[in-house]
Amino acid sequence: MVSWIISRLVVLIFGTLYPAYSSYKAVKTKNVKEYVKWMMYWIVFAFFTTAETLTDIVLSWFPFYFELKIAFVIWLLSPYTKGSSVLYRKFVHPTLSNKEKEIDEYITQARDKSYETMMRVGKRGLNLAANAAVTAAAKGQGVLSEKLRSFSMQDLTLIRDEDALPLQGPDGRLRASPGSLLDTIEDLGDDPTLSVRSGTNQADPRTEISEDDTGDKAPKRVKPIKKVPKPEPPASKTLKTRPKKKTSAGGDSA
């Protein structure tokens, strides 16, 4: 454990921070020799970091593994050994020169495939997100409509309960609630006989109003009243009376 901590400190301080500062100085002074030296070091150190990630998993159990790693980093940095320059000239540069074209082709193919994969995955992700948003909105709308429906039913029950209670007017008398009046009006509206009567009653005032309106607009003509002569009682018919025959006494006396 102690050797692992020491090796990590050595790699961070001597393998990363010190070369980074030296590279800054080389860029600042525009010293081509130092610039080339530290560029070779960073190329070798990149391969070392990649190999270290694998060897820490596989060879960490090996005795003196971390001590050997510390010694290797010091060998790379030492101005006497110039390990980074030796490794670059003998191994790294010849290998990269032989495989440069293949590496470039792999890089271009990987870039194109990664771009296509990213576009495909992005489109699929957008479709999934849109579908999820639509389903969530539909579910939310359904829940909201159910809640509104439940609230409306509760309000209706409350209104019916309030309608059942009689209201007391200012004069102390009980009066029907407006809800009950509405119910009775609806019931009367449903009755066909009452609807017919109401239709006739509604039609009569219109005619009366129209006649009154016409009377107001055009003055009525007053017909002169003719005096009807009173019928005279019929003359009594004279009864024809037959003359009485003279009595026979007068004849006898003659």
Curated annotation (Swiss-Prot):
Pfam families: TB2_DP1_HVA22. This is Receptor expression-enhancing protein 2. It comes from the Eukaryota. Keywords: Membrane, Phosphoprotein, Transmembrane, Transmembrane helix. It comes from Bos taurus (Bovine). Residues 205-219 have a biased composition (Basic and acidic residues). GO terms for biological process: endoplasmic reticulum tubular network organization. Residues 195-204 have a biased composition (Polar residues).
